[in-house]
Amino acid sequence: MMNGSALQRISDDIPRISNPLGLAAMGIATLGVGAALTRLRPSNREGRSQRFARMIEARLRATLEKQVTRGEYGNVNSAPWDVDRCEVQVNEGFGKPTVVSFTVVMTACGEELAEDLRARAAQGLLAAAVEAAWRNPEIAPIVIEGKLQNDDEDIVDMRALGYSSLQVRPEELFERLGAPAFDSGWKPV
């Protein structure tokens, strides 16, 4: 427990501002710094997950257009699927490979299309999405887990493309797709 004289010495060492004008100036300066930091901070900056989602969606839309142009669906002049949205989660961990997990929500189009043709188209779209994620310009190597859904029901997942599991490791992706775009010299150990 402190005695009165020790407490008095400590309180004497603490600087005091007793000038009202000085206190007002410090208060205004504090408000100014707070306002400046709020204005300078980017408020609507998107994260890596959003950039990956945009990249995958763009690749899927381009793939659908190419498939229709090449006539891969016979006499049908519309794509079998329409991309509603792409939900991506990029999980980075210390000492572990980054995991890119995505779900593309699709709507079925072109009712006259045969189911086997629609399923094959979905596999092609998932393969395009996996390649887009693997060839990203930001990080490598990555683990990829992806699937396509329609009405909360899985249409196709990584196993339908012949991968060994739902989460595909970088070594297996390298075997099929080569080196990632971010690090073209990368090879599995």
Please tell me what each predicted stretch does.
Residues 60, 112-138:
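Short, non-transmembrane amphipathic alpha-helical segments
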Residues 35-55:
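Transmembrane-cytosolic junction motif
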Residues 3-16:
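Juxtamembrane low-complexity tails/linkers enriched in Ser/Thr-Pro and polybasic
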Residues 138-189:
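Polar/charged, Gly/Pro-rich intrinsically disordered segments
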